[in-house]
Amino acid sequence: MHTLIKGVLEEILEEEVIIEYPKDREHGHYATPIAFNLAKVFKKSPLVIAEELALKISTHEKTQGLFDSIVACKGYINFTLSLDLLERFTQKALELKEQFGSQIKSERSQKIFLEFVSANPTGPLHIGHARGAVFGDSLAKIARFLGHEVLCEYYVNDMGSQIRLLGLSVWLAYREHVLKENVTYPEVFYKGEYIIEIAKKANNDLEPSLFKENEETIIEVLSGYAKDLMLLEIKDNLDALGIHFDSYASEKEIFKHKDAVFERLEKANALYEKDSKIWLKSSLYQDESDRVLIKEDKSYTYLTGDIVYHDEKFKQDYTKYINIWGADHHGYIARVKASLEFLGYDSNKLEVLLAQMVRLLKDNEPYKMSKRAGNFILIKDVIDDVGKDALRFIFLSKRLDTHLEFDVNTLKKQDSSNPIYYIHYANSRIHTMLEKSPFSKEEVLQTPLKNLNAEEKYLLFSTLSLPKAIESSFEEYGLQKMCEYAKTLASEFHRFYNAGKILDTPKAKELLKICLMVSLSLTNAFKLLGIEIKTKISAKD
């Protein structure tokens, strides 16, 4: 509907028209501030321009049957849609069923390479990883729903100093807990019960002869062994969140192509040597300073691996590349983009979304850290506590680039303070009514909408606003809009439900048809958030 109304107004006015939702529903379904934009051009008051444009629009043949009213108010032009238009879109939505909301397609389908999570396989996934994981998964769902082609990839950092440190940590734990030796740990190492678990499992799984080899050989084998175990656990954790990747890319394999990348960087005059190090001239592309790629000891920096990986990605020629990183990686954006320019790619194709910190509470106190993982809150612990769906909803309920704090006990309440419960409850009420109704679903679907009051029309309009919510959430990377949409629609439904008996009115079938639309919109919205909406709520819920 939004697209239709915008198109008609732009054709009549021959100007770009911004369509908004009025803050006060008494002002109608849509509004436009176009009069303010034209005030300087025509050197008139916005109030006068709004009156003139409202008259022009209302008398134009293309708007006949679209609106019940077009009113100029304080410089805005407010539009109330006709019931005929609402019914036309309602019928189409009910025919589309689970595809309702996907009819807004981008001008052309994009190929999107989406990389997210990519946590080092050196420990279990913690709550900080979950936010980017859930966001990336839902963004992919929405993009595909809108007709885009999406590849979701997890970049596995399976080489380098962190992996060796993992192997060393397991070896020291093996010596302490299996061999019962007195061990002195280094200042930096991986700790937690999971390291001890791996050490004990290695004792059962690996050949005893391994532990008679020299220490470097033992650490190398344990590094690979522990890394593989951690990656399996990470995949299990992601599965528990309902997240599945199309591809897992190995840094170790991709890094074999580093020589070819360095040759191209040298040809592009992107490198120089200073202080026995090899530097990238990233400052030429808005980086704060040049960056080291090869250190004095001839080892490679973390950035080098990122450059080789991005070269592999950009060879595949996607329309857009989206990375979801932790906010602490902000400084890496400019240097990676600089390397892409030197390698001959368009760095504007790369968009990096940053996930801010998460602070978890329970009874207004910091959530208990996991003994198994040391100073972290594990995803699995929180899923066991509140469930996958509640966790996904909360992580998506605020913009990715804002800090998120929430108390998990809120997600256990059975009232309006728990947003996901309140949405489930709305859908449950609808299904209970449909079961009690003397009318078949087919009767309800075939019932024309003729006798709706303003409040009922507004609720119907809200259900039909789902396509715009989906489109906006994708274009602005603002998936919180989907959560807000579902919360608002559920709240409007509860107000409608509590206002009077629905089944005991002469227009019961019309009202049930609105209820079907509420259920459809909530179900489709939740599906894109990776949540299965409930049709029944039991006492334990």
From Swiss-Prot:
GO terms for biological process: arginyl-tRNA aminoacylation. Pfam families: Arg_tRNA_synt_N, DALR_1, tRNA-synt_1d. It comes from the Bacteria. It catalyses: tRNA(Arg) + L-arginine + ATP = L-arginyl-tRNA(Arg) + AMP + diphosphate. It is found in: Cytoplasm. InterPro entries: aa-tRNA-synth_I_CS (IPR001412), Arg-tRNA-ligase (IPR001278), Arg-tRNA-synth_N (IPR005148), Arg-tRNA-synth_N_sf (IPR036695), ArgRS_core (IPR035684), DALR_anticod-bd (IPR008909), Rossmann-like_a/b/a_fold (IPR014729), tRNAsynth_Ia_anticodon-bd (IPR009080). One of its GO terms (molecular function) is arginine-tRNA ligase activity. Its EC number is 6.1.1.19. SUPFAM superfamilies: Anticodon-binding domain of a subclass of class I aminoacyl-tRNA synthetases, Arginyl-tRNA synthetase (ArgRS), N-terminal 'additional' domain, Nucleotidylyl transferase. The keyword Ligase applies. It is an enzyme of class 6 (ligase). CDD domains: ArgRS_core. A motif ('HIGH' region) lies at residues 119-129. PROSITE patterns: AA_TRNA_LIGASE_I (PS00178). NCBIfam families: argS (TIGR00456). Monomer. HAMAP family: Arg_tRNA_synth. Belongs to the class-I aminoacyl-tRNA synthetase family. This is Arginine--tRNA ligase. It comes from Helicobacter pylori (strain HPAG1). The gene is argS.
